[in-house]
Amino acid sequence: MEITVLIRVYDRIDDLKYNLQIIRDTWKDNNYHVIVVSNGKSKGYDIPSDSLRHIDKLVVLEENAGHRKGNSQLLMEGAKFIPESSQFTLILEADTWVYGDAIISKYAKRLAETPNAVWASADWYDKYYALATDFALIKTDYIRKHPGIFDFELFPECHITNFLRDTNSDFIWITENMPVHVPSYISYKYPYVPNIKEGRFYVFPKSKTVTHHIEFLKDGIEQKKGYFNIVSDTDYFPEAKISAKAWNRFKMRFWIGLTKCFVKRSWYSKKTYKEIEE
């Protein structure tokens, strides 16, 4: 299967370096065309030369559209370079590392078998219909017909579901990457939620994914490498060997799974579509 991987990056250059290595080393089920779009050049965040050999197309934007529009800018510019032969496009944050591509193959097959579904990613909010954009698989033909899917500022996850609704298109949840957040009333601390203000999990052992912002980890990227070894059940990063990986994965699954027992708004109130002010 022909799949384009559209990776966007601003300043997470080290994350990108390791992500590209992981893709080339462990994603073997499909034919991948890797596009990297960067908007950090004006601030000195250049793509290192040793990463270039893992990139099929590098798009460097001279200017950054800013905090509200930067993410949209990267996706819209990168989408211009998706090959005609690509059946699916995976949009990926530079700091989202996935061991192996079984999860991609699974949801590409499901999308192919579901005619009206064009997007697959995790459910983002409990209150609103919203879809994750850090790891999302999309039918490429839909992007070509509807480039506005990436034209957003605030609440990109809500924009996606609103846009799909308005174009009479469906989505599939990637349940292996759920739940993303703990309930908002968990305000002190929770295992595997390094930044309680965000209230977000950064490890997903079912999909063999880690997506940490390394500034939230005490030991930075070395700790992230250790988490990656745990979820992948490998010593992919030999410098960050972890013992008792199975026990650590059990703890991840337990604490993530436990949140399904916590009272949530969706238990007593239906999800709604968020009205986004332009």
Where do the protein language model's features map onto the residues?
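C-terminal catalytic/acceptor-binding lobe
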Residues: 158-278
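A conserved hydrophobic helix/loop-capping motif in glycosyltransferases and polysaccharide synthases
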Residues: 3-12
